[in-house]
Amino acid sequence: MGSTMEPPGGAYLHLGAVTSPVGTARMLQLAFGCTTFSLVAHRGGFGGVQGTFCMAAWGFCFAFSVLVVACEFTRLHSCLRLSWGNFTAAFAMLATLLCATAAVIYPLYFTRLECPPEPAGCMVRNFRLAASVFAGLLFLAYAAEVALTRARPGQVASYMATVSGLLKIVQAFVACIIFGALVHESRYGRYVATQWCVAVYSLCFMATVAVVVLSVMGHTGGLGCPFDRLVVVYTFLAVLLYLSAAVIWPVFCFDPKYGEPGRPSDCPRGSCPWDSQLVVAIFTYVNLLLYIVDLAYSQRIRFVPTL
């Protein structure tokens, strides 16, 4: 009789991918994501830019969660030319932010306690309430994965699992919010100073994305200089650049000499330049704070690029 050979790396299927605490969180992500998407698509309904964003966010997160679980369960991630630990940590943080945003937007724009006037209004309301609940649970499931996989003090970990790595995802996400406000009637082209602020946002965003991509692709070791040192230098420069934007943008948007100190009474809701300028100012300070915290943590991290 012939004999069977054991696979050299152990069992072909990795049961821990679905039974470990992280695996359990990922299975909950799949369950909650599918439920939320189905409730909205079946009867809850959506519309406009806000609803499209929510559906796109849930669909994106569900698709990539399926990919992560499948690759972990079948061990196929070892065949991919990327740093799997960095990829999963970065995706979990991005999914947490996307699902948190969708969990706020969908109830805010589509959920009401009273029944709509149409014949099936109460059923639609119930589906939307249920979708809002599961959207919140989906956010918690992704946040749980981030908490479980985050690098602890003294632990050997990939860069994206460290506080500094996770903050890179948040910084890029906040920059996208700033860009969204800039293109929405912000009038940033009126002054050279505000154009400088846009250049700051763009430069820091591209550099942050480059750090994330290099980490996920596992190419941080071939830069000719220690990657952690480059990250610290870049983060310090980003703090200085954002500090300049945090001073310049409010002056040229809200000082009476250049802009409006208060919201004009005749400014139309939904297309008011002052509102967009305020959003940019708020999230400029948010990102400045994130870069300062990042700089503080970057001084102490030690990571393994190939994990």
UniProtKB/Swiss-Prot annotation:
- Where is this chain's protein located in or outside the cell? Membrane
Ribonucleoprotein: is it a keyword of this entry?
no
What are the GO cellular component annotations? Answer: cytoplasm; membrane
Which keywords belong to this entry? Membrane, Repeat, Transmembrane, Transmembrane helix
Query: One Pfam family this chain carries?
Result: MARVEL
Membrane topology, record value: Multi-pass membrane protein
Q: Which InterPro entries does the UniProt record give?
A: Marvel, MYADM-like
Q: Which domain of life is it from?
A: Eukaryota
Specify the MARVEL domain's residue ranges: 17-154, 159-303
Q: Where are the transmembrane segments?
A: 53-73, 90-110, 129-149, 163-183, 198-218, 232-252, 278-298
The set of disulfide-linked cysteines is none
* Assigned protein family: Belongs to the MAL family.
From the Swiss-Prot or TrEMBL record, give the protein name. Answer: Myeloid-associated differentiation marker-like protein 2
Q: Which gene encodes it?
A: Myadml2
